[in-house]
A protein has these predicted regions:
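N-terminal leader/targeting and accessory segments in enzymes
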Residues: 1-121
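Phosphate-binding loop of NTP-binding sites
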Residues: 88-91, 100-207
């Protein structure tokens, strides 16, 4: 008998959820995850996206050029603020997406909560829209190795299964709609990303 993992039907598509929203992405980063998330967000056609980072580095310029072109092609307004995160960006945007390197207890995010601004991260957005069953791996050490090996084992039963999460260039949100709904996704999820995950969780969790 074939193995099955149950799924949960989601009420909205990403495009419906992000329509007419002004987005703030805090943290572009240089490891590729922030860039991939920004690409995905732009393709959902929000009204606008502001991307901020506390660093002001020439290393960002290739990513900025590519994201600017992508935004123009998708008719999305885009703005970059480098060297700081600003209060005005918290106040003027509808939804805040935080990079995993951003501590959740910084004053700007405290302000966001006071102003009732929704705060999301890669994992929480992923669980708003995922139609596949998921297996989550968290813990102190060995998460990536465990994630890759579990995916390797699952491929014997689910050849189209994929893995990602806290892995460079493979953020969870970029995995949406990549494989048929009944095929599982194996995720590496750091504990600090789980802090924002409220009423959703992996179908199977490993610590």
């Amino acid at each position: 008998m074939a193995t099955t993992l149950s799924t949960t039907r989601q009420p909205q598509s990403p495009a419906e959820f992000f329509a007419k929203k002004n987005l703030l992405q805090m943290g572009l980063g240089i490891l590729g995850g922030g860039f991939t998330i920004a690409q995905w967000l732009i393709k959902q056609h929000p009204k606008s996206i502001t991307i901020t980072d506390s660093k002001n580095s020439d290393d960002f310029q290739p990513a900025i050029k590519k994201l600017t072109t992508l935004a123009q092609n998708n008719k999305v307004k885009i703005k970059f603020v480098l060297g700081k995160h600003r209060q005005q960006d918290i106040l003027t945007n509808d939804l805040i997406i935080v990079n995993q390197a951003i501590p959740l207890d910084i004053p700007l995010l405290k302000l966001a909560r006071e102003k009732k601004k929704p705060i999301e991260n890669d994992i929480t957005l992923f669980y708003k829209f995922v139609k596949n069953p998921t297996l989550g791996i968290t813990g102190t050490r060995g998460k990536t190795t465990t994630t890759i090996w579990l995916h390797h084992l699952l491929k014997s039963q689910f050849p189209k299964s994929i893995f990602g999460g806290n892995i460079p260039h493979k953020p969870a949100i970029s995995l949406l709609n990549k494989i048929p709904p009944k095929n599982p996704i194996v995720l590496e999820i750091p504990s600090f990303q789980l802090e924002l995950l409220k009423d959703k969780s992996p179908r199977i969790a490993v610590i």
